[in-house]
């Protein structure tokens, strides 16, 4: 899929907001193929939810992570030296009571430097009804928030970490 991108604009957006969103990366057909691959793998080996390093045993997650468009976007954020650390499926089906609490990826994943990024790539429709990702533009400029462990059974995050002091109005 050939996607015209202004890499400089992506970089500026990342600097300003702390994230880049709404960039079409895959064709609908490619998304369907990757979703089917994930579901086929689950039929064979069980749930992939929060199985770390999925890219080391399945080709589909490695293909997603090394897609040229994905790499261009990541390069616009952190430069050309890119190392893939982990691919994890975080499965949250539409209309389920599950949710992802407010958190900062660097803290959640135990990363120490802000030259590391996480990429969320939806393999299903993600909108207000189905439960899309929410971000707080510019929150990365406020430093790291304290996180607390919670026992919220509907929190999709493995450790239940929730950032304290989040003001959604900012």
Q: Could you describe each region identified by the protein language model?
A:
Residues 103, 110-128:
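Short, conserved beta-strand element in jelly-roll/cupin
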């Amino acid at each position: 899929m050939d996607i015209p991108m202004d890499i400089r604009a992506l970089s500026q957006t990342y600097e300003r907001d702390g994230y880049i969103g709404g960039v079409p990366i895959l064709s609908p057909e490619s998304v369907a193929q990757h979703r089917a691959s994930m579901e086929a793998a689950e039929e064979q080996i069980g749930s992939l939810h929060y199985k770390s390093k999925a890219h080391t045993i399945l080709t589909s997650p490695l293909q997603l992570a090394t897609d040229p468009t994905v790499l261009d976007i990541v390069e616009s954020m952190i430069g050309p030296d890119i190392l893939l650390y982990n691919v994890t499926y975080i499965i949250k089906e539409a209309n389920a009571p599950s949710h992802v609490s407010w958190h900062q990826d660097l803290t959640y994943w135990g990363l120490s430097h802000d030259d590391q990024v996480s990429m969320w790539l939806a393999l299903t429709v993600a909108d207000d009804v189905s439960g899309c990702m929410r971000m707080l533009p510019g929150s990365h400029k406020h430093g790291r928030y304290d996180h607390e462990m919670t026992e919220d059974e509907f929190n999709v995050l493995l450790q239940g970490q929730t950032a304290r002091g989040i003001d959604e109005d900012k």
